[in-house]
């Protein structure tokens, strides 16, 4: 039986971080965490592209373009959707997640979903460097591992 597992060795691949500007107080921290995590694992700044889009709704289309270019080993999607008084939150969060999954399944490029879908701003703060860590950092580590794993898989 063959066992495949990725690790955190720095690959030669480029990484794309696609982040929304909406809720920038949160997303800026997520982006910084992702960049620090990649750099801390041997990925140079010249191998990281940061792409800003207006909001979470626009992340999947940008991810699709980036994935189709074939220039990146993985895409890290970062955003923050906070529940409001209408159902808009549910549409944006759910369809963003579906779009990101569709991109990675159609292109074979790993897309890490770091788009926070939270009830309150305090929940987002907890996941952007607070008591629940930094989801940008976590997505970057998963991206590193997946890039290495994809190189191993037949």
Curated annotation (Swiss-Prot):
It comes from Xanthomonas oryzae pv. oryzae (strain PXO99A). The keyword Transferase applies. HAMAP family: Lumazine_synth. SUPFAM superfamilies: Lumazine synthase. This is 6,7-dimethyl-8-ribityllumazine synthase. Belongs to the DMRL synthase family. GO terms for biological process: riboflavin biosynthetic process. (2S)-2-hydroxy-3-oxobutyl phosphate binds at residues 85-86, 127. One of its GO terms (molecular function) is 6,7-dimethyl-8-ribityllumazine synthase activity.
């Amino acid at each position: 039986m063959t066992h495949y597992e990725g690790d955190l060795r720095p690959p030669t691949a480029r990484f794309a971080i696609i982040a929304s500007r909406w809720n920038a107080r949160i997303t800026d921290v997520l982006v910084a965490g992702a960049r620090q995590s990649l750099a801390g694992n041997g990925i140079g700044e010249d191998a990281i592209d940061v792409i800003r889009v207006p909001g979470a709704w626009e992340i999947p289309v940008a991810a699709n373009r980036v994935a189709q270019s074939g220039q990146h080993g993985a895409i890290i999607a970062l955003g923050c959707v906070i529940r409001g008084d209408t159902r808009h939150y549910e549409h944006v969060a759910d369809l963003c997640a579906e779009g990101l999954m569709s991109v990675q399944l159609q292109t074979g490029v790993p897309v890490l979903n770091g788009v926070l879908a939270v009830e309150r701003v305090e929940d987002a703060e907890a996941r952007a460097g607070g008591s629940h860590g930094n989801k940008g950092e976590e997505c970057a580590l998963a991206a590193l591992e997946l890039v290495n794993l994809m190189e191993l898989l037949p």
